[in-house]
Regions:
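Positively charged n-region of N-terminal signal peptides that target proteins for export
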Residues: 1-6
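Bacterial N-terminal signal peptides
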Residues: 8-18
Length: 287
C-alpha cells in the first residue's frame, strides 16, 4: 500500500525542516491522502492482510513518524482504502522526500509493493483538502471508531456557490433536528474530476446507522415542508451524481500512532503487528 508520492518530490523544497504531522493527532487534517486498492477476486481478507503487514513492519522498523489507517469495503467493489493526513502540502512533500532518502525503508516498501501488486486489480490515489465550513462537528480522534460512511458528491461545473448554500442549509437542519450528527467534508484537489466532495462520517457501531435512519424524520421536521422543497430543488440543480459506501476499519493493515494503540491496544495492536519481522527476513527474493 504505502507509496510515497513522486509528484511532491518535484516541488520546491522550501523549509525542509518543517515538522511532518502525525496522521492521527487530535486535530482535523488539512490535507488528506487516500490510496485505494481494488482486489482481485479471492485476494481480500487474510491474504491481503498478510501482504500489508510488510508495509506496517517496514514503517515500524523505521520508526516512521507519519501514520495511516486502513479500511475495507462493506459495499461496492472489493477494495481497501489507506488514509494518511498532513498539516500541509509542504509536510506531505517533506515526508516523501525523507522516505526517499531512507534507503532501508525505500527498499522494504519496494519489496512490499511488488508482492502486494500481485493481489491487485487496480489502484489509484486522491488528494483532498478539509472544508471546515462544510463540516459539522467532525471527530478529530477516530481511535474508538470502527466504521466509516463515505459519501461522494459530484457538483456540476459553475454550481459551487449553489452547492455551498445546499450544505449550509443541510447543516442548519441537522444541527436543529439531529444534534448528534457529525461529518467531515473534504474537497478533492488532485487525482479526480473537479467538483468532487467527500463526506466522511465515522461510527463506533453500526447501531448508530440504525438510529440515524430512525431519526431522519427529525431532520425533515427541522427543515419544514418549504425548506425541504427548496433543498431538494437546489440539490438536484447543483449535484450531478452521488454515491454512498460503507467501510470497516482494519487494524491489521493500519500503522496507528502510539496514542491510538494506547486507547485500545487489544484492537489497534493485533498479534500480526506485535513484533515486526527481523530485517533479514525482508531480504527474500521477489517471486
Amino acid at each position: 500500500m504505502r507509496k510515497f508520492s513522486k509528484f511532491v518530490l518535484g516541488l520546491s523544497l522550501v523549509g525542509a525542516c518543517a515538522c511532518v504531522s502525525a496522521a492521527q493527532d487530535k486535530s482535523i487534517p488539512k490535507v488528506l491522502e487516500i490510496q485505494r486498492e481494488y482486489l482481485k477476486p479471492g485476494r481480500s481478507g487474510a491474504v491481503h492482510q498478510k501482504a500489508e503487514s510488510a508495509f506496517v513492519s517496514a514503517m515500524a522498523r523505521a520508526k516512521w513518524p507519519t501514520h495511516y489507517f486502513a479500511m475495507t469495503s462493506l459495499s461496492g467493489k472489493t477494495r481497501a482504502l489507506f488514509l494518511t493526513s498532513y498539516d500541509s502540502f509542504e509536510a506531505w512533500e517533506n515526508d516523501s522526500a525523507a522516505a526517499e532518502k531512507n534507503a532501508a525503508l525505500s527498499a522494504a516498501l519496494d519489496r512490499a509493493n511488488y508482492n502486494d501488486g500481485e493481489l491487485l486489480e487496480s489502484a489509484d490515489q486522491g488528494i483532498f483538502v478539509f472544508r471546515e465550513e462544510m463540516s459539522l462537528r467532525p471527530r478529530p480522534d477516530l481511535s474508538q471508531m470502527r466504521f466509516m460512511e463515505v459519501r461522494v458528491f459530484h457538483v456540476r461545473p459553475g454550481k459551487e456557490k449553489e452547492w455551498s448554500e445546499v450544505v449550509k442549509m443541510a447543516k442548519a437542519g441537522y444541527e436543529k433536528g439531529l444534534p448528534d450528527s457529525h461529518w467531515g467534508m473534504f474537497e478533492q484537489v488532485y487525482g479526480g474530476d473537479g467538483g468532487t466532495y467527500l463526506l466522511l462520517s465515522s461510527h463506533k457501531s453500526l447501531s448508530e446507522i440504525d438510529k440515524a435512519f430512525a431519526s431522519d424524520k427529525n431532520f425533515v421536521a427541522a427543515m419544514g415542508e418549504e425548506g425541504m422543497k427548496k433543498l431538494d430543488e437546489m440539490f438536484a440543480s447543483c449535484v450531478e451524481s452521488t454515491s454512498e459506501q460503507l467501510f470497516a476499519f482494519s487494524p491489521e493493515m493500519s500503522y496507528p500512532s502510539d496514542d491510538w494503540i494506547k486507547s485500545d491496544p487489544g484492537y489497534w495492536k493485533p498479534k500480526t503487528m506485535a513484533a515486526p519481522k527481523a530485517a533479514a527476513a525482508e531480504k527474500t527474493d521477489k517471486p
